[in-house]
């Protein structure tokens, strides 16, 4: 039998089953819901974990939602913040499956709109739904099998109704009983934490938008300050603070197996400061564009500081800067 050579092996090794890992994570959260001040519900046969809509949720629920988005293929935790972060805690993430966990799972690429209901959906269920160009380009979308559970997180200040559940299950190709959702608004503790855990995801999505081969990213680490939640019901405030934590406070480090020229061509463009919209609290930017995400410069949505280590040459690139004054204004400090 011929032995495999290094060139025969995938750069990042054999990838795990994202949907199965997410399903196991959901079971753990579902069984521990009460301890996380969350409420387990059944809606139209689907299991829905309320982590901040009608209940208070918790810091622990925030970590759980972040893990769920990532298919539990990343380590997410709270760490003491630095003086530059202005707050007490930061959310840190590290992963050795960056493309699968962050772009296949965590990216909020599904705008759920059914009748009067709207939510931004993330999680591995997106791969079963498909319909996203990025998932197709990265070969991450697939049809559901009889064994699959569609698992995801909704950012919304209301719970989905039966019509929403049925529509989402249909798009994922599963029975409603195999749909597993967690829901939290951006103004809740859990909702804030799961959004702020997206530091690495925003860097990878930016690289993909810059047409860099993101499969060359082998491992990644990121952190961002956990902002104080906005007042309950102030959705724009919640979106603003969590985005500002990312745009002006997030730091990401990527370990990349690529040639220097390829890295050099994009490194300075990855941080948020490369956008013309950079420099003001996101709530102000959002208002300028009449609260239409699609009018905001897509190059804005990225971390404040990005460091890239080349595994081929040993070189390091570091670009961007932390913007304390913008965060102070956004966080009401």
From Swiss-Prot:
Q: Which UniProt keywords apply?
A: Cytoplasm, Hydrolase, One-carbon metabolism
- Compartments, as annotated in UniProt: Cytoplasm
- GO CC annotations, alphabetized: cytoplasm
> EC number(s) on record?
3.5.4.27
What biological process terms from GO does the record include? Answer: formaldehyde catabolic process; one-carbon metabolic process
Q: Provide the top EC class.
A: hydrolase
Biological pathway: One-carbon metabolism; formaldehyde degradation; formate from formaldehyde (H(4)MPT route): step 3/5
Query: Quick check: keyword Zinc in the entry?
Result: no
Q: Name one GO molecular function term.
A: methenyltetrahydromethanopterin cyclohydrolase activity
Q: Name one Pfam family in it.
A: MCH
The protein's annotated catalytic reaction(s) are: 5,10-methenyl-5,6,7,8-tetrahydromethanopterin + H2O = N(5)-formyl-5,6,7,8-tetrahydromethanopterin + H(+)
Give a yes or no for keyword Cytoplasm in this entry: yes
- Transmembrane spans: none
Family under the similarity heading? Belongs to the MCH family.
Protein role: Catalyzes the hydrolysis of methenyl-H(4)MPT(+) to 5-formyl-H(4)MPT.
Q: Which HAMAP family match?
A: McH
Identification of the protein by name: Methenyltetrahydromethanopterin cyclohydrolase
